């Protein structure tokens, strides 16, 4: 049974400005494993990754019906890749199945998350 659906978007230009300021925002938003992946990236890919992970966490919190804040924090949600390069999302705040989707172009990053109860 579907528990929730969340969608979010962020402008690439906004993320570029954040990345240019250094790693403090990335360290706040990304889990240690996500941050380790982020540090290996450069340029456009780094912007897409940070923006995508931020937006996925927003989408997850919307699907939970809480938004980011008191119940769901940045460190409660992690998205890594499986062996085929698909995003795999886990959370300490939800025990069911999580289906993330992400797309981006030169202007926008859009994410979508579906939560399914077990």
Swiss-Prot record:
| Superkingdom classification of source | Bacteria
Q: Which organism is it from?
A: Lactobacillus helveticus (strain DPC 4571)
Which keywords does UniProt give here?
A: Cytoplasm, Fatty acid biosynthesis, Fatty acid metabolism, Lipid biosynthesis, Lipid metabolism, Magnesium, Metal-binding, Transferase
Can you tell me which residues bind Mg(2+)? Answer: 8, 58
Q: Where in the cell is it found?
A: Cytoplasm
Instruction: Supply the Pfam families for this chain.
Output: ACPS (PF01648)
One GO MF annotation is:
holo-[acyl-carrier-protein] synthase activity
The UniProt entry's GO biological process terms, in alphabetical order, are: fatty acid biosynthetic process
Q: Which reaction does it catalyse?
A: apo-[ACP] + CoA = holo-[ACP] + adenosine 3',5'-bisphosphate + H(+)
Please give the name of this protein: Holo-[acyl-carrier-protein] synthase
Enzyme Commission numbers on file: 2.7.8.7
Function (record text):
Transfers the 4'-phosphopantetheine moiety from coenzyme A to a Ser of acyl-carrier-protein.
Q: Which SUPFAM superfamilies match?
A: 4'-phosphopantetheinyl transferase
